[in-house]
Every structure is written in C-alpha cells, then in structure tokens.
Amino acid sequence: MANSASAIKRIELNERNRLRNKTYKSMLKTYYKKCIVAIETTNNNDLETSNLRELVAITQSKIDKAVQKGIIHSNNGSAKKAKLTKRLKEKKISL
C-alpha cells in the first residue's frame, strides 16, 4: 500500500480514470458491434443505407475521440475504422 499522501491520491485518481475509460471502451465496443450487425443485415435500400451511413459516421467519430483521449492506441483505432470500411466495400455500400 502507498505510504505518502500523493501516492494515495494518485491511486484514487488512477482508479477513477480506469473506470471512466472502461465505460467509454464499453460504449465504443457497443457502437462497433451495432455497426457490424447493421452492415451485415442491410438490403441496400435508401432508408437503411442512410441510417447505416449515419451509424458508421458516429462510430468512426467515437473511435477518433477515444484515440484523442488516449483510451485506445491510434493503430487500434485505425484498424477498427479500416475493418468497418472494408466491410462496407464488400457489401458495395458507399459512404
């Protein structure tokens, strides 16, 4: 256990940040999974495609924000965005 007051404060701060990052990562995974499911189940009609475009844009924005905040590594964020784009291209859906 930490002896100094600053070390104790740092432990509390680290725990608070860990919990915040955990919730953000969980939200990010949820958006990513929703996006993958939406891509796989789309029928290329106009309404579904527009909703899908919006969902992909939101997901990519959330990934970028997670990278900016240091929650995920930049390479991890780039890989996630590339996988989304690859799945869209396989389904022949343009953004």
Swiss-Prot record:
Bias (Basic residues) ranges: 80-95
Pfam families membership: Ribosomal_S20p
Gene3D superfamilies assigned to the protein according to its UniProt record, in alphabetical order: Ribosomal protein S20 (1.20.58.110)
Chief localisation class: plastid
GO cellular component, one term: small ribosomal subunit
Job description of the protein: Binds directly to 16S ribosomal RNA.
Protein name (Swiss-Prot/TrEMBL): Small ribosomal subunit protein bS20c
Organism of derivation: Guillardia theta
